[in-house]
Amino acid sequence: AFINDQIYVIGGINDANGLGSDDLEFFEGGAEFYKFAHIGWTPSKDERYFRNVHVMAWHVDEREDLGIDSAHGVTLAANWTWNDQIMAFARIGFSKGSAPIYNESATLGAIYKFLYRSDLVGLAVNHGSPPDDDLSDQTSVEAFWRFQFSQGLAITPSTICAFTCPICPIRR
């Protein structure tokens, strides 16, 4: 919800144990929640998807049945589009706990839009540090091309090159 023409806030709470396949059985693992609060700035409401800076804080409760400790974190992100054609984006996040995939993560990237077709091509690099000290950091690069066939139909092939594997133990 916008609180003025440039500042917006979003918040939410979800079942931390919820899955799309659990037939709407809410809180089966108990009242364990994922909560978030998000505040952002954009030059105008019309530009909110193309030019913005935002911060999000989150917390997930301990999930006793699964043996997962509570965790929390914060993310700062921004994207900016020039001439309706080139978008640069950046995101940095920090968290505490063993539940997140990464406790530290940074991403930089860019997207180019072909004005005559609405196709997009993008490239991003990410570096992340998993919460387990026995796992290595990961640096990866992703490239994609979104072929926009019509307003409601797009196909987006992508390729990812991971330079290290966080699920592989560090070789000593």
Region spans (language model):
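Outer-membrane beta-barrel transmembrane strands
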Residues: 1-2, 9-12, 57, 157, ...
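Extracellular loop and loop/strand-boundary signature of outer-membrane beta-barrel proteins
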Residues: 21-27, 94-96, 128-131, 165-167
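Secondary-structure transition into beta-strands, especially the periplasmic turns and strand N-termini
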Residues: 4-9, 82, 86, 119, ...
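C-terminal regions of proteins
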Residues: 129, 134, 138-140, 145, ...
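Surface-exposed coil loops of outer-membrane beta-barrel proteins
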Residues: 1-38, 124
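Detector for outer-membrane/organellar transmembrane beta-barrel domains
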Residues: 37, 41-131, 143
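Conserved active-site loop/cleft motifs that coordinate metal ions or position small ligands
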Residues: 10, 121-124, 144, 149, ...
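Outer-membrane beta-barrel "beta-signal"
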Residues: 171-172
